[in-house]
Each structure stands twice: as structure tokens, then as C-alpha cells.
């Protein structure tokens, strides 16, 4: 199952820099492991925003929920999820 996910990050201004840096380091490691596994095949930064558009390729809604709630920055995110399916006019043979 493919999902388009927008993640907007809002780290509190009063969070100590060391704490924010540690959370961001864990977030990077977690997201890169998911990218290497193929569960998170695409991620794009939104210019001028602390946000991204991502594509997730997972087995179920529950799996996606577990991945998203496992993000170290989850508590500081607004997340919008849109399920995707192949368009009948697509010229691609795969989901990439």
C-alpha cells in the first residue's frame, strides 16, 4: 500500500538545543533505516518550511501508523496521510 504523507515539524522554541539535536539525530537514524528497508522510498524537503513530503510503501494502515508514531519527532509533528493507488494513465510498470 502506498501513502503520501506530509509532515510539518514544530519544535518548541524553549526546547534546549542539546535535546532537540538528540531527537533529530534519532529521527535521522530511524528514517534512514526505513528508507534502506524500502518502507520509506521517497522523501522531499519543502523549500522554506520545516516540512517534508514522503511516500511510504507498507503492508497496512496499522504498519504505517506504527512507523509514524515511532518517529522520534512525532510529538512535534502535524501529519497528513493520503492513500494512493495507481492511476490508469500511468506509463510506469512499477510503483516507483
UniProtKB/Swiss-Prot annotation:
Gene3D superfamilies: Dimeric alpha+beta barrel. Keywords: Aromatic hydrocarbons catabolism, Isomerase. Disulfide bonds: none annotated. GO terms for biological process: beta-ketoadipate pathway. Pathway: Aromatic compound metabolism; beta-ketoadipate pathway; 5-oxo-4,5-dihydro-2-furylacetate from catechol: step 3/3. Pfam families: MIase. It is an enzyme of class 5 (isomerase). It comes from the Bacteria. One of its GO terms (molecular function) is muconolactone delta-isomerase activity. The keyword Isomerase applies. Its EC number is 5.3.3.4. Belongs to the muconolactone Delta-isomerase family. NCBIfam families: muco_delta. This is Muconolactone Delta-isomerase 1. The gene is catC1.
Amino acid at each position: 500500500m502506498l501513502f503520501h504523507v506530509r509532515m510539518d515539524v514544530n519544535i518548541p522554541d524553549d526546547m534546549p538545543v542539546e535535546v532537540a539535536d538528540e531527537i533529530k539525530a534519532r529521527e535521522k537514524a530511524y528514517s534512514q533505516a526505513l528508507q534502506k528497508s524500502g518502507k520509506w522510498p521517497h522523501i522531499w524537503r519543502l523549500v522554506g518550511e520545516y516540512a517534508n513530503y514522503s511516500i511510504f510503501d507498507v503492508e497496512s494502515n496499522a504498519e504505517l501508523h506504527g512507523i509514524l508514531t515511532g518517529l522520534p519527532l512525532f510529538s512535534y509533528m502535524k501529519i497528513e496521510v493520503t492513500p494512493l493507488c495507481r492511476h490508469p494513465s500511468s506509463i510506469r510498470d512499477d510503483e516507483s
